[in-house]
Amino acid sequence: MEIRDIRAVLFDMDGTLVDSDAVVDRSWSTWATEYGLSPAEVLAVAHGNPAAATVAQFLPDVSDSERAVAGARVLELECDDVSDVVPTPGAHELIATLERLGLPWAVYTSAPNRLAKVRLEAAGISPSILVTIDDVAHGKPDPEGYLRVAELVGVEIEHCLVVEDTLVGLAAGRASGATTAGLKGVPADIRLPDLHHLVQLFTE
């Protein structure tokens, strides 16, 4: 699909619109250490993955209540640490460009609602439509979230561009039927060095 055929842009949050990599690394490293796990092994899957899925993967033998406590601990660590959460390069410019062109945009994130709002506010980004892991039954790589956010935006998914920075997120976008754009070298229909490049594509 050509860029001119795109009628809405659906963004991932962490690593795509919001640079929270350092916070994610710190929070999950602390959590892993507290639970006697390897921070490197946990970090290898934590980025872009729903926190509950990561917790379940590394604590498969604990009770549901213990797993809930572990998940709450991660959320506490992440919500309390926004010291260096910033917009990714080009994020504000791209949003301004989309709004100038009359193209709706929205955010779908694997983060829970509380954390998403904290990070978006820290980065100075205010989506009118936000779908989080709290709003869906199945997180990424399931396409449910992107299908849901496209419905809320009011644009058929085939005319949406999903912008992601992880393989699991792009898998969700691809499965939804959207055109995909990938940051950080991940394979997608459109590969982006940064969001400035997407500004150029929409305005050239």
Where are these regions (language model features)?
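Asp-based, Mg2+/Mn2+-dependent phosphohydrolase catalytic module
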Residues: 1-8, 96-99, 103, 112-204
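A generic secondary-structure micro-motif detector
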Residues: 18, 41, 84, 106, ...
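Hydrophobic residues in well-ordered beta-strands that form the structural core
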Residues: 19, 107-109, 182
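N-terminal helical cap/lid subdomain that shapes the substrate entry/recognition surface
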Residues: 2-93, 99-101, 112-117
